[in-house]
Swiss-Prot record:
Its EC number is 6.3.4.19. GO terms for cellular component: cytoplasm. One of its GO terms (biological process) is tRNA modification. Its main location: cytoplasm. Belongs to the tRNA(Ile)-lysidine synthase family. ATP binds at S32, G33, G34, S35, D36, S37. The N-terminal region contains the highly conserved SGGXDS motif, predicted to be a P-loop motif involved in ATP binding. The keyword Cytoplasm applies. Signal peptide: none annotated. The keyword Cytoplasm applies. The gene is tilS. Ligates lysine onto the cytidine present at position 34 of the AUA codon-specific tRNA(Ile) that contains the anticodon CAU, in an ATP-dependent manner. Cytidine is converted to lysidine, thus changing the amino acid specificity of the tRNA from methionine to isoleucine. This is tRNA(Ile)-lysidine synthase. Keywords: ATP-binding, Cytoplasm, Ligase, Nucleotide-binding, tRNA processing.
């Protein structure tokens, strides 16, 4: 089955992604059987990527065992190795099913990655997934540098995660499959409004687009990209100040010269990283208090859980 279309032939981002891929390695594909992962399945075949398909059967539906069998048969027809992992009732638990399932799913993928010495794990996250994450983080008041959750290439410990579809909307993936008569699974949990993602997908995004009168997915993607660029920029700007900081166990000292204090956003970002490196999670309110003392060249002693933060003109000390 070939998926070549105007979308894929003209997609320079996909071309760049696969041009940089080490084709001598064998990869893993997380294959749910939904439109997203099935599209990626055929795309990897078309691009000549060697991979093993990994399917996790959560046992949530009476049809899940049959669906797993059909995916195994598909892989056999296409000459793709297939690995099935079926969760037991004990493994699934009875609370926070969505999060528990995700943890089990990734744990098995990471274990398979190491056992098979794979080159990476392909995941079929797409533009809508990314936009949902950006909006969720924005509404949760995440820092401006932390809005983008997923990258085309990222590492979790020693595991390489590959997401080549982040710039492509789900509708385009489904259209490509529908145009070729390729059937895919419809997961009812994607429509189950007990889950936040489903509520965002079914209610929040359509409502915002109706009220706003425009598609909001790609503006959110742009915001996520700029968030990642801002993070990279701040890392470079902050490096001289980090280099001057000292850490010993959970204590530390951060010099804050006037040139840093005069840049409020950068100064608070540097301080946040400084506290994080000492194992201290700080709120925006706390950072603002510390910054206010620095900007006024005033002294203060603040308690933060079991730590004492001492502020003097031009320096912050963790004791």
């Amino acid at each position: 089955m070939v998926l070549s279309s105007d979308l894929l032939r003209d997609d320079k981002q996909l071309d760049l992604f696969f041009a940089s891929l080490d084709v001598k390695k064998r990869y893993l594909l997380a294959l749910s059987g939904g439109s997203d992962s099935l599209f990626l399945f055929y795309l990897l075949k078309e691009r000549g990527v060697s991979f093993t398909a990994v399917h996790i059967d959560h046992g949530w539906r009476s049809t899940s065992a049959q669906e797993a069998k059909e995916l195994e048969e598909l892989c056999a027809r296409e000459g793709v190795p297939f690995v099935l992992y079926t969760l037991t009732a004990e493994e699934q638990g009875d609370k926070d099913l969505e999060n528990q399932a995700r943890k089990k799913r990734y744990a098995f993928l990471y274990e398979s990655y190491r056992q098979l010495d794979a080159g990476g794990i392909f995941l079929a996250h797409h533009a809508n997934d990314q936009a949902e994450t950006v909006l969720k983080r924005l509404l949760e008041s995440a820092h401006l540098t932390n809005l983008k959750a997923m990258a085309e290439r990222s590492y979790v410990e020693d595991v390489l995660l590959l997401r080549p579809l982040l710039h492509i909307p789900k509708s385009s993936l489904k259209e490509a499959l529908d145009a070729r008569g390729i059937s895919y699974l419809q997961d009812p949990s994607n429509e189950d409004e007990r889950y936040l993602r489903a509520r965002m997908r079914k209610k929040l995004f359509p409502w915002l687009e109706e009220v706003f009168g425009k598609n909001i997915t790609f503006p959110l993607l742009t915001l996520g990209e700029e968030s990642a660029e801002l993070s990279e920029y701040l890392e470079k700007q902050a490096q001289p100040f980090f280099s001057a900081a000292t850490h010993q166990d959970s204590q530390g000292e951060l010099p804050c010269p006037d040139c840093l204090i005069q840049q409020a956003f950068l100064c608070k970002w540097v301080m946040k990283k400084f506290f994080n490196n000492a194992g201290i999670a700080v709120s925006r309110h706390f950072l603002q208090m510390v910054y206010d003392h620095l900007s006024r060249s005033s002294c203060a002693t603040l308690r933060m859980r079991n730590k004492i933060v001492i502020i003097k003109p031009g320096v912050v000390v963790i004791d």
